[in-house]
């Protein structure tokens, strides 16, 4: 299975100049990294998710590379146009050059109170425009401490089950247009990291749950996110249940981001 390493830039960098500098560093690092050469890039797909205001410019810079571009969110109100101040639709995001969008990140769930119903609508709109979805799930520190991880994840995965029920005509697209990113909330940006064994067991549960929804979902891509860095990437990449990484802070430094991608590329050999 092809690995994926996705850089979620969040509300960074601050200026267009900084964005271009990061892209310069990233492209230069890729060109000099043997394991991430064009011949080997098929083993690990790299994607970055810039701020919306930089999306079109980043896509323009990356159009002649193998790096894909994603949005960090999409409107749940409409797939195309409408009187929704401050929103950006899936159609508009595709027009800006993105081929994927992140949905359900814990920061969106926390700061914008995004519910399963809201995320279902966003998923429907995204996939109706052939905008792939990186769907984030994960438990809080309290839920982890009280051993509720799998229960929480099952509740979050209900969005996928409901999508299949409501949009059966789109189910065939899911194996190639849906990626799950398991990000324990307590590990995001904290430096706290679950063991590889814990992540592997959780990923196995996620894969089995998805396979139970539909036969076509028996081999889904599941990434890990949460304080992934250059130092721990090899240990995660070595586990066959972990298909890649959703990277936050470490994606803002080209060298660290490429070290993570290289780890998964080598593990896919």
From Swiss-Prot:
Q: Which annotated residues bind substrate?
A: 8-10, 189, 227, 248-249
Gene Ontology terms for molecular function: triose-phosphate isomerase activity
Describe which pathway this protein belongs to, using the record's wording.
Answer: Carbohydrate biosynthesis; gluconeogenesis; Carbohydrate degradation; glycolysis; D-glyceraldehyde 3-phosphate from glycerone phosphate: step 1/1
InterPro entries, per the entry: Aldolase_TIM, TIM_sf, TrioseP_Isoase_bac/euk, Triosephosphate_isomerase, Triosephosphate_isomerase_AS
Task of the protein: Involved in the gluconeogenesis. Catalyzes stereospecifically the conversion of dihydroxyacetone phosphate (DHAP) to D-glyceraldehyde-3-phosphate (G3P).
- The protein's name is Triosephosphate isomerase
What the entry lists under PANTHER family is as follows: TRIOSEPHOSPHATE ISOMERASE (PTHR21139:SF42)
Source organism per entry reads Moraxella sp
Q: Which gene encodes it?
A: tpiA
- Source taxonomy lineage? Bacteria, Pseudomonadati, Pseudomonadota, Gammaproteobacteria, Moraxellales
The protein's annotated catalytic reaction(s) are:
D-glyceraldehyde 3-phosphate = dihydroxyacetone phosphate
């Amino acid at each position: 299975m092809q690995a994926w390493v996705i850089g979620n830039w969040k509300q960074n960098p601050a200026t267009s100049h900084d964005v271009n500098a990061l892209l310069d560093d990233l492209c230069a690092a890729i060109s000099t990294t043997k394991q991430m050469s064009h011949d080997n890039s098929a083993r690990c797909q790299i994607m970055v998710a810039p701020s919306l205001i930089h999306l079109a410019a980043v896509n323009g810079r990356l159009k002649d590379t193998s790096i894909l571009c994603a949005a960090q969110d999409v409107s749940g109100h409409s797939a195309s146009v409408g009187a929704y101040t401050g929103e950006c639709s899936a159609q508009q995001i595709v027009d800006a050059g993105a081929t994927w969008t992140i949905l359900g990140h814990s920061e969106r769930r926390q700061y914008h109170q995004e519910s399963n119903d809201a995320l279902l609508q966003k998923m429907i709109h995204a996939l109706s425009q052939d905008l792939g979805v990186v769907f984030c799930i994960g438990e809080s520190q309290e839920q982890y401490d009280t051993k509720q991880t799998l229960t929480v994840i099952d509740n979050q995965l209900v969005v996928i089950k409901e999508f299949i029920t409501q949009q059966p005509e789109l189910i065939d697209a899911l194996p190639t247009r849906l990626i799950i990113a398991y990000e324990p909330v307590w590990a995001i940006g904290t430096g706290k990291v679950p063991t590889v064994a814990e992540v592997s067991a959780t990923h196995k549960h996620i894969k089995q749950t998805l396979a139970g929804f539909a036969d076509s979902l028996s081999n889904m891509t599941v990434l890990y996110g949460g304080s992934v860095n250059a130092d721990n990437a090899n240990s995660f990449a070595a586990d066959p249940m972990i298909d890649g990484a959703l990277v936050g802070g470490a994606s803002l430094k080209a060298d660290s981001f490429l070290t993570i991608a290289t780890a998964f590329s080598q593990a896919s050999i």
